[in-house]
Amino acid sequence: MIAIIDYGAGNIKSLQFALTKLELDSCLTTDKQTIENATAIILPGVGAFKDAIEALGELDLIRTIQQEASSGKPLLGICLGMQLFYERSYEDGDWQGLGLIQGDVKRIAESVKVPHMGWNTLSHRQKNPLLSNIKENAYVYFVHSYAVSSYQKEDLVSSADYGGMVPAVVQKENIIGMQFHPEKSGEVGLQLLQNFGEMIS
Amino acid sequence: MLAKRIVPCLDVDKGRVVKGRKFQNIQDVDDPVDLAKKYNQAGADELVFYDITASNENRNIFLDVVENVAAEIAIPFSVGGGIRTITDIHQTLRAGADKVSINSAAIKNPQLIKDAALKFGSQCVVLSIDAKAVSENTWQVYINGGRTNTEIDAIGWAIKGEQLGAGEIVINAIDVDGEKNGYNLELTRAIADKVNIPIIASGGAGTKEHFANVLQKGGADAALAASVFHYSEIQIPDLKEYLAASNIIVRREI
């Protein structure tokens, strides 16, 4: 069972529908016990960094997520969920993240339209089972105004080009992030979720 | 590279897709879920659903449509029509929509755009503007399905919309809507030049060349159309092949 952390606003139904199509069991939850018993955790996310980290704080889930991460359980962060895994974000201030991956989050360069909205191509930066059956230059759907800006090179799995290099898929051991929305990225997105599913089975 | 988007638009009335001309002469077209699946398979980049009745008693029928669409397709879609409050937005997103499109309600209450952007993020707040020419290079915003002139300058309203926190703008050119003589390139370009958020052009698509023109000369990031797709006058794979041959970046492998 994959625990999808349901900590507030946004479209998480599509994620559940996508997992169901792939025959991956999931539930929406904020319950610690359910999260601890799950085989994997997905942290979705749309909205503002501050609201999201505060919502996780109010639900008393920050330590739970950190503990599950250090126990080696697979975690997937999608969009803002991925950004929350990092140490800091400078979205309308200076906010502390979950600190599971080294690096920080900054606004996308003003030289391009913000938000980065639409289908963009992936450039693979390493060989990784997460990219199994995902072609170089495959299109995925992005919607975000902030992006990971400093990071460890070895954590970068695939990237997109938008006003500079945008980390798109990252992995640090059991912690995985996707800046785009795999549940909204057609067949390519479903394959990426399936690749995550293979890691946890 | 970021691709330009092709966006079929589905007007939904009491659970069915319909098509009108200049917002009149409404005709039945198809089941929304079947049509959404068809466009998804054909390579549409995104879909837009407008609830054109938007009366309270039909609201739940429409939210069922949203949920059924979300279950069947894995591409983004936005939903508009009758969205007036934060609660409407919350319900629509929870039903599985990725974005909401706000039109008349934003004119009456601009704070709605701001509140929605703060609560749900700019990325899911689309400002939809129905504009009509009042003189050369001057367009004003119409509401209530194109019936009421607000006398608000369309370009100024687009700029204000971005400031309020909208993440995207749909610009519907009422003068050319349903005529199939091409998008309003001047209006689209005038707005694209003034804002730094993505622009979706709407109204007037009749040929593949019209799409190429609005994505290049019009400066649009996406092109929306309804009847040319509903009546299979243009097939999306053919359109994308044509655009790629015109040096426009489009997503072709789905």
Language model features: what each stretch is:
Chain A
Residues M178-S201:
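Acyltransferase
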Residues I42-P44:
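Structural motif
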